[in-house]
Regions:
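Hydrophobic alpha-helical transmembrane segments
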Residues: 1-175, 179, 187-322
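Glycine-rich phosphate/dinucleotide-binding loop and adjoining beta-alpha-beta core of small-molecule
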Residues: 184
Length: 322
């Protein structure tokens, strides 16, 4: 029974995410973490103006401890009061940390706009899920950006937090999401964030090292399950998985490019500045709007495989503890 109680929150959290997606109208813990980071950033820039690297370390540790210890305390209290109250709360917390449905919904807005031949609407939709400047993107560039985002965020938004929750429940999942949120907000190499965001960026690279590679391998397996090109997925992953400034981002992008037999990445504009980037994959065929749907299928299949793996891992860990 105790092993069952340990695995229910992760399973229930994923099911809730698949059914409901992000509750945009309700307070979201990750958005609260984002606001906390913004407040701390202003304080750090004021108090550590001449030592921003140190300030970034202080900020990161503060965010990580706060984001993980608060849910840990709440869960300890609820489990002490009633075990099923704890299970319900942890299930909800796990649900908040997964973004599969949100990723699908937002990318499908791009797909629908492309189908309607409304390039401006598609450009606006894709701007909500990518960090690059979208104004220079043509139709194929918009599709490519959406596919890349689904591929990359399969790890960041779904399987990586799932793996951390499998290891340490919701509190460890919040630890990961806090680090990932900091990286997305301050982990840039621009002059503004180079020093204050250095620690957050490096920490995110470390935390994602294993999850991104494990996700890539599961995505290759998913390519075979979905009758995509599994051989090319393996080939392109082996060849192009390091073609990114981040040691982790190209892992799943390379698999997706190979599985779909398209070319992703390449030069992109950020904050009005052109960044030269290598291509990932081969343009065996021209990218098309249906590739957004295919990328989502890859994302969901990979997520289910990771869920099965993490559920087994959590059961084994609790079996050893008990």
């Amino acid at each position: 029974m105790k092993i069952l109680i340990a695995v229910i929150p992760l399973l229930a959290g994923f099911l809730l995410d698949c059914l409901l997606g992000d509750p945009y109208s309700l307070p979201h813990p990750i958005r609260l973490i984002g606001r906390f980071i913004s407040i701390l950033e202003k304080w750090v820039r004021c108090r550590f103006s001449s030592r921003l690297v140190l300030g970034g370390v202080v900020m990161s540790i503060t965010v990580l401890l706060t984001s993980s210890l608060i849910p840990l305390g709440l869960l300890m209290l609820c489990y002490k009061l009633n075990v099923w109250l704890g299970v319900v709360l942890e299930s909800v917390l796990c649900y908040y940390m997964l973004a599969a449905r949100c990723l699908r919904n937002e990318s499908m807005k791009v797909y629908k706009a492309i189908v309607e031949n409304d390039t401006e609407k598609a450009r606006k939709a894709v701007s909500m899920i990518v960090g690059r400047d979208t104004k220079p993107l043509d139709r194929n560039g918009i599709i490519r950006a959406a596919v890349e985002t689904v591929a990359e965020n399969t790890s960041d938004g779904v399987t990586a937090p799932m793996l951390f929750m499998g290891l340490g429940g919701a509190p460890l999942g919040f630890f990961y999401k806090a680090a990932n949120t900091m990286d997305s907000m301050i982990g840039y190499t621009s002059e503004k964030y180079l020093h204050i965001g250095r620690f957050a960026a490096k920490l995110d690279d470390v935390l994602n090292y294993i999850p991104s590679r494990l996700t890539a391998l599961l995505m290759i397996l998913s390519a075979g399950i979905l009758n995509f090109d599994i051989k090319n997925a393996w080939k392109i992953w082996r060849r192009d998985r390091r073609k990114h400034a981040s040691p982790n981002s190209a892992q799943t992008e390379a698999v997706c490019a190979g599985a779909l037999r398209v070319r992703l990445a390449g030069d992109a504009w950020y904050f009005g500045e052109l960044h030269r980037k290598p291509f990932i994959g081969d343009d065996i065929r021209e990218i098309e709007n249906e590739d957004i749907r295919r990328a989502n299928r890859l994302m969901y299949c990979t997520s289910v495989l990771m869920l099965a793996l993490c559920t087994g891992l959590r059961a084994i860990l609790w079996g050893c503890i008990l």
